[in-house]
Structures are given as structure tokens and as C-alpha cells.
Amino acid sequence: MVKIPCRSENGQVVNIEVSDSVFDRVYNEALVHQIVTSYLANARSGTRAQKGRSEVAGSTRKQWRQKGTGRARVGAASNPLWRGGGKIFPNKPTENFTKKVNRKMYRAGMCTIFSQLLRNSKLVAISEFRVETTKTKFFLQKLKNYQLENVMIITDEVDENLYLASRNVPNIKVVEIDLIDPVSLLSYDNVVITREAVNKIESVLQ
């Protein structure tokens, strides 16, 4: 079992045991890349659209006669080779960008990310993180006790006060276990996780 320090708000530190299979995995860059690209691809709205030569507005008149001008032959102004013409092989909203990753691979990739964060001292465990009011000022004062910036806070469940107090703060994200994703974990300089969230992550990812 791996031991990680768990800090309380008053500065006390207690070592807690965590699962090797979740927090002590060998870093697998290829697997992490696969689950990140899958997440980003599945998040695409797929609404991009371009017009082909048959969809561009304009006359279908031939621009000049076929022979005798010395110039290359040409048809309508919607010719894809001309400026303002249609596009060859235009993108359509019917494209499917979905990339599937098996559940076992996704869980292994998330464990790899958590292990690497702990290895690089970017994962900070705390006893709990709660605020008594929705005022952002009090939330920032509490966060200042841990001396962290650009941080993602993972809790077992987000209470309304914590969510409302933190939502307008730049470079801060508060999320519960069910909503964590690989891109967010890799985007922040520090990841703060509560003790209850550690237990829940172990039960979900093992």
C-alpha cells in the first residue's frame, strides 16, 4: 500500500494508505494519449458544414467560350478551383467523430494519471473542503491556507455553497468524483482531493 500525506485546514498532516492499483501505476503515455483523444473527440459537436460546388449561390453560366481565347477552358464560377467557388469534399454535420475506449482501458488510464500526479507531487490530499457561505472571498481565504494556485478540487460530492463560491474564480475548478475527466486532470498545476473522494475513487477505478 502507498502512503500519501493528508493535510487538514489547521496544518496537521496524517499519512493515509491508498491502493497501489490506483495510485502506484507505471505511467503509460500511449494509453493516456488514447483516452485523452477519445474524450476530446467525443466532446465535439460535429456541426461544421461547408458548401460544395452544387450548393454555392451564383450563376451556372460558362465564364467564356470553350475555344479561341487562349485561356484554359472553364465552366461555372462555382468551380472549386476559383475563389468563392465550392469546396472539394466539403465537411458535413453528418460526420461521426466518436472514438470508443473500453471501460477497462479508461479506468487503467485514469489510474495512470492519478499515479503520475502523485509521483510529481501535484496531487494533494486534504481531510475535507467545505465553506459555510457562498461568498467567493471566504472560499479564496480558505484556499490560501493550502498555498495553491491553478487547482482542480475533487470532492466526494459538491455542496451548493462550495459550487457557488468557486464558480467565478479563474483557474479553479470544483468537481465531484462522477464528473472528473482526463483532460481536466492534466490541465491544472495541482489537484486537490478530499479523503472521502480518495476512498470513492478507489472503489470506482479498482
UniProtKB/Swiss-Prot annotation:
InterPro entries: Ribosomal_uL4 (IPR002136), Ribosomal_uL4-like (IPR013005), Ribosomal_uL4_dom_sf (IPR023574). Residues 47-71 are annotated as: Disordered. One of the primary rRNA binding proteins, this protein initially binds near the 5'-end of the 23S rRNA. It is important during the early stages of 50S assembly. It makes multiple contacts with different domains of the 23S rRNA in the assembled 50S subunit and ribosome. This is Large ribosomal subunit protein uL4. It comes from Nitrosomonas eutropha (strain DSM 101675 / C91 / Nm57). Part of the 50S ribosomal subunit. The gene is rplD. One of its GO terms (biological process) is translation. Keywords: Ribonucleoprotein, Ribosomal protein, RNA-binding, rRNA-binding. It comes from the Bacteria. Belongs to the universal ribosomal protein uL4 family.
